[in-house]
Regions:
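Short acidic/His/Gly/Ser-rich catalytic and metal-binding motifs that mark active-site loops
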Residues: 67-72, 181-191
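N-terminal beta1-alpha1-beta2 submodule of the flavodoxin-like/Rossmannoid cofactor-binding fold
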Residues: 1-131, 194, 198-252
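Short, glycine-/small-residue-rich phosphate/pyrophosphate-handling segment
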Residues: 38, 130-185, 203-206
Length: 252
């Protein structure tokens, strides 16, 4: 696990707030099962270290290791699956103030495990919080992308769009990643000539640091504010007939 740089440690020591009441779920959507090393895990380590240095409770999940069935229902064993670990995984994500999804790039796209995670999150999108809003309101999300082909921004675009559609709040610059040279070659953290590749890449370290801190800042703001104000966005109130000043569409 890479250590934080002096600059990153200095930022942690001068934090403008406390974050030790926050929880973060870092979900690695690598296609590799444990104990195979994951390049995506290596970059997620940087985010995890920044969070932990600020007292955040960090829960690491390698999605590939869990027997999560594909589908868009809360429990796919009720829809034909032989087994489904999602009912055990879901509370770990639901209770986190911060969700960071890590994915490799394959054929210019996020991994199939990442797509499955997003679909399972979508299956929970009808859940409501105590204010009658969708369950993901008041939570923040970001993503980490690795690979040795272009596609960081394309993958980040899809992941972050999906998260905001579900109700997550996305801070500025909520994606970061590393890609190597085009074609087969070393990936993030691979050792070449005695040195790990990409660890000292300033662009990657800067963007990863900015993402981690923007997630912390926004999670702090939303938590202190009690979440997103509950007006004009409550599914329970809409279903009860409230239209929040929406004009009557009938012709008069």
């Amino acid at each position: 696990m890479p250590d934080l740089s002096d600059r990153q440690r200095d930022l942690c020591s001068t934090a403008p707030a406390t974050y030790d009441d926050l929880r973060a779920a870092l979900v690695n959507c690598t296609l590799k099962p444990s104990p195979q090393p994951s390049h995506t895990d290596t970059l997620l380590d940087v985010v995890g270290h920044i969070f932990q240095a600020n007292g955040v409770e960090v829960d690491r999940v390698r999605f590939r290791d869990l027997e999560v069935a594909p589908g868009v229902y809360p429990d796919m064993t009720e829809h034909g699956a032989d087994a489904d670990a999602w009912p055990e995984v879901w509370p770990r994500i639901r209770d986190a103030h911060i969700l960071v999804i890590g994915t490799p790039i394959w054929l210019g796209e996020k991994s199939s495990e990442c797509q499955k995670l997003i679909e399972r999150l979508y299956g929970m999108s009808s859940e409501l919080n105590d204010a009658g809003q969708y369950a993901f309101y008041g939570r923040v999300g970001g993503c980490i992308v690795t690979g040795n082909e272009d596609g960081i921004k394309h993958v980040g675009m899809g992941v972050l769009y999906s998260l905001q559609h579900l109700g997550y709040t996305i801070p500025p610059q909520a994606d970061a990643g590393w890609i190597g040279e085009a074609g087969p070659g070393p990936s993030y953290g691979d050792v070449v000539d005695g040195e790990p590749v990409g660890i000292d890449n300033d662009f990657t370290q800067r963007n990863t640091t900015f993402m981690a801190w923007n997630l912390l800042h926004l999670a702090r703001m939303l938590t202190d504010a009690g979440g997103i104000p509950a007006h004009g966005n409550q599914r329970s109130a809409w279903d009860a007939g409230c239209r929040f000043d929406y004009e009557n569409p009938e012709y008069r």
